[in-house]
A protein has these predicted regions:
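Extracellular Cys-Trp
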Residues: 1-99, 137, 142-143
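Glycine-centered secondary-structure boundary/capping sites
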Residues: 32-34, 44, 98-107, 112-121, ...
């Protein structure tokens, strides 16, 4: 596990490049989209990429693995009924009372929080007597749940369409054929 900026940026760019284009999908390229979740101690971290999210922590807390803690708390609800905004990382390596282990709150000035927000870097905050990750965004500013939800819908829709195509010897170009194909689309969107 490497947390240096060059690794964070390289892995972010790798994840972004993993999304196939429509032309590639049409040519039969398999869809193996990646999503990268990383952590940084650089308050000026800036890497405008899609399909990657980074969480900031102070250097002395880097071993608490806030990226894994954040992912571990939210990912089990994937893909349905989840938003990555306003979530608390759990089961970190920070010492806590009563057996609860959370990650440590970074010590940030308002200007540093503003810089992290501007660069779309997530961080643990304490507002209204609650600790949570405020934004839940990718490095390009898109919400994490939008990206992952879109991936899930695309995969589910593709699976349902293949089921229809493989289980029906003939799908005509009339209303009933289009209706049959539309059921896969509507079912994926309804799930």
């Amino acid at each position: 596990d490497r947390d240096e900026d060059e690794f964070v940026m390289a892995l972010s760019k790798f994840a972004e490049a993993s999304e196939p284009t429509e032309a590639e999908l049409g040519a039969g390229v398999e869809d193996h989209r990646k999503f990268y979740m990383g952590q940084t101690t650089n308050k000026k971290c800036a890497c405008y990429t899609a399909r990657a999210a980074v969480i900031y922590t102070d250097p002395e807390f880097i071993d608490e693995e806030p990226d894994a803690s954040y992912t571990g708390n939210v990912a089990p609800f994937y893909p349905k009924n989840v938003t990555w905004k306003f979530k608390r990382p759990q089961d970190g390596n920070a010492p806590a009372s009563a057996g609860t282990k959370l990650i440590s709150l970074p010590k940030l000035k308002e200007s540093e929080r503003d810089a992290l927000d501007e660069n779309h870097v997530n961080y643990l905050t304490d507002e209204y007597k609650r600790q949570y990750v405020k934004e839940g965004v990718c490095l390009n500013g898109e919400f994490i749940d939008i990206v992952i939800g879109g991936d899930w819908i695309a995969k589910r829709m593709r699976d349902l369409l293949y089921d229809i195509l493989l289980n029906n010897a003939n799908i005509n170009y009339g209303d009933d054929g289009f209706g049959l194909v539309a059921t896969a689309v509507l079912q994926a969107l309804a799930e």
